[in-house]
Amino acid sequence: CILIALGILYGSAKSSVQRRITLNQLAQKESSTGNWAFDTSMDAINQYKENTIHNLLRYTHREQDKRLRDAAVAKIKTYENWETELTDTLEQGELPNVYWVYAFLDGNNIEHPDNFIQPVEHSIGRISDGVRASLKDPYSLDMGYVNIEAFCRVLDTHFKDSATVFRPGIESLQKALEINAPERKDKKNKQWFDETLSASRMAVKNWLESNK
């Protein structure tokens, strides 16, 4: 299912660049109507009744079909404490779940950005730890479970005025990214890993330079 695959693969540390390109090309060829994957995803959103918004976040990233994204965001905002769920995840959630919060924030509005500042600040240290652990492990492609380019966009989009709060953490993240990482054992995804690491380093460098 191409659209579902795109949702799962957005920024995924275990997908290759070529695979992403192929999926995007296939998705563009599909009809926008009568598509089983799209209809199934839309039904899942419309019928969603879980107590948490967590499993809706996968539909909200910027590479998702806009119709699915809009429907999922609208559903999320019917939950009274949806922003609290996001901030709680940033504070205490597992790193893969933190990834989905930043995927949501990368392109969607929030109502009380001030409530996110401390949770975001705290999450940076955890992201740095995850990146550091991933880079040191030649078998790992995780890169800390977070799309660093998207993360930097989120900081600039929602929290530009709080750059001084985040700067120490981002400097620590930069140091984590500069680790001399051993070559990945997974030769198939080595190029993707190297390109992702380079792009992540550049995103952090650019953020620090533009937020002095």
Question: Over which residues does each language-model region extend?
Answer:
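Extended repeat-based scaffolds of very large eukaryotic assembly and lipid-transport proteins
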Residues: 1-212
